[in-house]
Amino acid sequence: MEWNTLVLGLLVLSVVAESSGNNSSTSTSATTSKSSASVSTTKLTTVATTSATTTTTTTLSTTSTKLSSTTHDPNVMRRHANDDFYKAHCTSHMYELSLSSFAAWWTMLNALILMGAFCIVLRHCCFQNFTATTTKGY
């Protein structure tokens, strides 16, 4: 708030200094201060008329507007009927092997491919070693 007061004071001084040489002047300035909670707009209008009598009119209007925020619904995901996340009562059926899902079949297929590749590489290495030792005549 001190920053707005300082800017407002500088505007008033500049308008008064500017209007001292003229017979009539009007100056309008607007400053905007933004924060995460609200937007505050200050508008200063100064009218100075120089004649036999000096009349100075200063009008200050301030408008504050609260920024819109999104609402957060904490119940986006509903709990399951059998949910006991913090009190997990494990039963034996939780550890049974199941082939009823695609993930189980995919994992088993990957394991078979990996074992097959390992056997092929192992056979190749052993065969190379066997042929290398037998060709020398040992």
Swiss-Prot record:
HAMAP family: HSV_GN (MF_04037). It comes from Human cytomegalovirus (strain AD169). The keyword Transmembrane applies. Belongs to the herpesviridae glycoprotein N family. This is Envelope glycoprotein N. Residues 123-138 are intravirion. Pfam families: Herpes_UL73, UL73_N. Keywords: Disulfide bond, Host Golgi apparatus, Host membrane, Membrane, Signal, Transmembrane, Transmembrane helix, Viral envelope protein, Virion. Residues 1-21 form the signal peptide. It is a single-pass type I membrane protein. The chain crosses the membrane at residues 102-122. O-glycosylated. Envelope glycoprotein necessary for proper maturation of gM and modulation of its membrane fusion activity. Also plays a critical role in virion morphogenesis. It comes from the Viruses. GO terms for cellular component: host cell Golgi apparatus; host cell membrane; membrane; viral envelope; virion membrane. Its main location: virion. The keyword Hydrolase does not apply. Interacts (via N-terminus) with gM (via N-terminus). The gM-gN heterodimer forms the gCII complex. It is found in: Virion membrane; Host membrane; Host Golgi apparatus, Host trans-Golgi network. Residues 22-101 are virion surface.
